[in-house]
Each structure stands twice: as C-alpha cells, then as structure tokens.
Amino acid sequence: MRRAAKVDTNQAEIVQDLRELGCTVQSIASVGRGVPDLLVGWKGKNYLFEIKDPAKVPSKRILTEDELSWQLAWRGQVRTIESTYQALEEMA
C-alpha cells in the first residue's frame, strides 16, 4: 500500500496566492509516484510545479528518486519552486 503523499507546508500559501492572482490551481500531490504537486492554469497555458519547502535543510529539498524519474520521463516542462514569486517567474 502506498503511503499518503506529504504536502510541503508552504503549498497552501502558494495555492492561495496563485488563486488570488487569477490562476486555476489543482493539487495533484495525492497522485504520488513522483507526479508534481500542482497543476496551474494561467493565461491559456498549463504549468506543473513541484514544491519544496525553503524552511527545510537543503538535503531535504532535493527531488526524491520518484520525482526525478517522473521528471526525466515527462516530455513537457515541470519546474521546482519554493515560493509564489518563483512560480510567477516561471509563468512570466
């Protein structure tokens, strides 16, 4: 049986901020198996974001084996972010 997906503590704030800016945001963290945390729609484009918590030590912010494997196999873009600001930079 698969363990429940862990959601980074900063995810709720990022989701709220993006929604307030007019983005559609769907958490897909519960899919697990390395799938990114958020699917974001903004100005007719989709973005996949893996969220890492900047409050954790750097060794705890690296991609897991599953996350890395998923990203290497994915034929689209996916970005790792730690803040709303980084998400907005990626969507600019």
Predicted regions and their residues:
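Catalytic phosphate/metal-binding cores of nucleic-acid and nucleotide-processing enzymes, i.e., regions
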Residues: 1-92
